[in-house]
Each structure stands twice: as structure tokens, then as C-alpha cells.
């Protein structure tokens, strides 16, 4: 098994390093050969194809028959595109070429699909087509692109100008565009922010904030119909280290250092963040009139407990 993994990793590295269509095809064939040989030698079959192949299949399905502008770039032009900005995540074009770059082997180390499964699941229950969506923390535009492919009208914000530029570039690569605003959400909302929207899309940001309660108090009243929130939380009061009061209510929190705030695109904008207790977070959301609140995912990750919450008025 270890030998097979080593062969797979070597073949994957060759695929990721390939510059021409011919080299990519050859590397892909080697991957398929290794996987087939492993399946033939074991009792339990591999249920899914290798991740890169699976992501490419998803990409083709998500884009449909429309050729993305990035697919018309030559290999040299795409290489230049990928070098111009400090990417931390990548997707694939319709030929299986990388758009962007990976951050590291253990973080965003493989290509992402264009529509996040959390978005797909939410869309099945609450269709996004034709709805206005406020996306908090667009990062490099992958979630933004997913929302647009699902038919939403998106306004996306981020506190780092390089993330706004990367989002703009990735959307161009796939023939999409939306309203993009530079806004550090630790600060008051700018006048240019829309006054209202149908859905608040909030994935992977809240647990990076030093003021999560004030932040949600500003955004939830402007949210007319639905919330998709994905964040780390504290399980109970025993895990908290402090509390703070906002608007006459007390919230239990645990202070977390944001040690890479100045160097990592994945960190928050301040030197610390506050993790909320799940019960307090649910109470806060409900206080803004979201009567139908569902915890659709509750899991343990590297940085602790993480939940996906849907809420509807």
C-alpha cells in the first residue's frame, strides 16, 4: 500500500508539473494505470476516481457547454496568469490545466471544484438563481464563482486588495463578473455596501474576527431571507476563556491568536479572534428573526469544532 501511495504521489506530481497538453495526457494515463493496477490487486474496489480526475469531471459539468476564456489561453499565457498574483488555491480549466496555484501540500493542496458542495446543498433547499447574495470574504473567488454559476446576483467583499484582484481575475478566467468591494469587515460598513440582500453567504470568516457579534449585528438585519454560515465554534462554556457584552447581552468566547495576520492570506486582519459558543451563536442569529435555523453539519477539524448553519426567515 505504501509503495502504491508513493507511485500515486509521484504520478500526481508529474501531472501538476506538466506544461504541455501532451505531458499532461501522459501523466494522466500513468495515474489511471496505477489506480487500475491497485484495484486489480485488492478485494475492495476504489469507489471514486483519483481526485484530480474527479475535480475535472465536476468542472466540466459545472461549466456546461460554454467555453471559459481561460481555456483559450496558450500554456505560456496561462503560466504567466498564474505567476502574476500570489495565489493560494487553484481550480481547473476545461482542459484540466491549473488556474491559480496551491498554497502548500497540506492546505489547498489539490484543485477545487467550481461549486462548493455546501453551496450545492443550500441551493437545493433554497434556490439561489435570481437572488441577491452578499458574500463575506471572497478570498480568491472560488465561492464567488460557485454562486454565480448557480445563478445568484453577487456582491462580494474582502479586506485584502490582493484578494479582490484575485477574485476579479478568476471570475474573468471563467467568463463571469460581479460587484466587488474592498472592505475590512472588522471596520464599519462603507456607504457603498448594499442596504439589503436576500442571502448572506458567510463561509470561513467569522472565526477570524475579533468582533463577531457586532459584525453579525450589522449584517443580519440587512439579510432578507436566508443565511449560509460555516464557522468554528466552542462546544460549551468549559472551553471559553472570557466573555464580552454587546447590546445588553453577554457572549462567551475563547480568544484565539491570529499569528499570521500579516503574512498569510488565510488569517484574519487583527492579531486575535473570538470563537463563540455554539448556543450563543444560535441565540444571536435567532434574535434577528431567523425562526427556521438548522445545524446541517457538525464536525471536528484541525482547528476544532466546526459547524454549517442554515437560517431562514
Roles of regions detected by a PLM:
Residues 1-101, 120, 172, 290-292, ...:
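Non-catalytic N-terminal targeting/anchoring module and adjacent flexible stem/linker
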Residues 140-150:
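Conserved SAM-binding loop of SAM-dependent methyltransferases across substrates and taxa
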Residues 131-139:
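Conserved class I S-adenosyl-L-methionine
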Residues 167-168:
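Conserved SAM-binding loop
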Residues 175-187:
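Conserved SAM-binding strand-loop segment of SAM-dependent methyltransferases
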Residues 109-129:
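Conserved alpha-helix/loop element of class I SAM-dependent methyltransferases that forms part
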Residues 197, 202, 210-312:
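S-adenosyl-L-methionine-dependent methyltransferase catalytic module, highlighting the catalytic core
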Residues 153-159:
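Conserved SAM-binding motif I beta-strand of class I
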Amino acid at each position: 500500500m505504501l509503495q502504491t501511495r508513493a507511485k500515486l504521489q509521484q504520478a500526481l506530481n508529474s501531472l501538476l508539473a506538466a506544461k504541455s497538453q501532451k505531458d499532461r495526457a501522459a501523466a494522466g494515463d500513468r495515474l489511471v494505470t496505477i489506480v487500475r493496477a491497485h484495484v486489480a490487486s485488492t478485494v475492495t474496489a476504489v469507489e471514486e476516481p483519483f481526485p484530480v480526475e474527479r475535480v475535472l469531471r465536476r468542472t466540466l459539468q459545472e461549466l456546461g457547454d460554454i467555453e471559459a476564456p481561460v481555456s483559450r489561453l496558450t500554456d505560456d499565457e496561462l503560466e504567466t496568469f498564474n505567476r502574476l498574483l500570489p495565489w493560494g488555491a487553484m481550480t481547473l480549466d476545461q482542459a484540466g490545466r491549473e488556474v491559480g496555484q496551491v498554497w502548500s501540500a497540506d492546505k489547498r493542496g489539490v484543485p477545487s471544484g467550481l461549486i462548493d458542495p455546501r453551496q450545492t446543498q443550500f441551493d437545493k433547499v433554497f434556490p439561489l438563481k435570481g437572488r441577491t447574495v452578499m458574500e463575506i470574504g471572497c478570498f480568491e473567488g472560488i465561492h464567488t464563482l460557485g454562486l454565480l454559476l448557480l445563478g445568484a446576483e453577487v456582491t462580494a467583499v474582502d479586506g485584502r486588495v490582493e484578494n479582490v484582484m484575485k477574485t476579479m481575475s478568476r471570475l474573468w478566467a471563467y467568463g463571469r463578473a460581479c460587484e466587488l468591494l474592498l472592505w475590512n469587515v472588522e471596520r464599519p460598513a462603507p456607504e457603498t455596501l448594499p442596504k439589503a440582500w436576500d442571502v448572506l453567504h458567510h463561509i470561513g470568516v467569522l472565526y477570524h474576527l475579533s468582533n463577531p457579534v457586532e459584525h453579525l449585528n450589522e449584517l443580519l438585519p440587512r439579510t432578507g431571507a436566508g443565511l449560509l454560515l460555516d464557522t468554528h465554534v466552542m462546544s460549551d462554556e468549559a472551553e471559553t476563556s472570557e466573555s464580552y457584552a454587546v447590546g445588553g447581552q453577554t457572549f462567551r468566547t475563547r480568544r484565539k491568536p491570529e499569528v499570521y495576520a500579516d503574512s498569510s492570506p488565510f488569517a484574519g486582519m487583527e492579531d486575535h479572534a473570538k470563537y463563540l459558543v455554539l448556543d450563543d451563536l444560535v441565540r444571536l442569529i435567532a434574535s434577528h428573526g431567523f425562526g427556521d435555523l438548522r445545524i446541517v453539519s457538525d464536525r471536528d477539524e484541525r482547528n476544532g469544532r466546526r459547524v454549517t448553519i442554515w437560517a431562514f426567515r
